Amino acid sequence: MRKCKIGIVGFGTVGSGIYNILSSAVDTHPILKEIEIVKIAVKDLGKKRDIQLDNNLLIDDPFKLINDPSIDVIVEVMGGVDLAKDIILQSLKLGKSVVTANKAVIARYGEEIYKTASKEGVYILSEAAVCGGIPIIEPLKRSLKSNSIKKMVGIINGTTNFILSKMQMKKLIIRRL
């Protein structure tokens, strides 16, 4: 079986965390042996990094990364909106599935992004951008397939989850928080 080759766009806290997990936890789950990070797009090639990695993985042009025909999946964790949208859409149009944790780009351009993914027959996986990474999107899509949900609205994020958890665990009232 051929390995799934991944390109990461962005190497801040989230990008470097993904790199650490995927490169150091290979023995923890068999699927990780089938994944290979082949390129990482960064803003500054000369930046000193606290993480051990092969500098040959680094590239400073995200469009060169997404246009690399050897890369199967793009992980967009660069933040921002317009450039991230362009990278996501171009990746999808190139037939590459995309994983993103970018709340802002999904909130602003989600409809266009999802339509493009559907048209191109690839995936856009954005669950990490919703509810602090709580796995809610896929279960809702699978469990409620026969229903016609048009829209979901709410304020659920990591901070809200933290506050609600503290309230539940310690029976705190909002004034004390």
What do the PLM-derived regions correspond to, one by one?
Residues 15-16:
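N-terminal Rossmann-fold NAD(P) dinucleotide-binding loop
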Residues 56, 94-97, 120-122:
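A short helix->loop->beta-strand "cap" motif at the edges of active sites that frequently abuts
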Residues 60-101:
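Rossmann-fold NAD(P) dinucleotide-binding segment
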Residues 142-177:
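Conserved anion/nucleotide-ligand pocket segment
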Residues 11:
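Glycine-rich Rossmann-fold phosphate-binding loop(s) that bind the pyrophosphate
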Residues 85-90, 103-141:
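Rossmann-fold NAD(P)-binding glycine/threonine-rich loop
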Residues 24-51:
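NAD(P)-binding Rossmann-fold cofactor-contacting core
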Residues 6-8, 76:
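Hydrophobic Val/Ile/Leu positions in short beta-strands of Rossmann-like dinucleotide-binding domains
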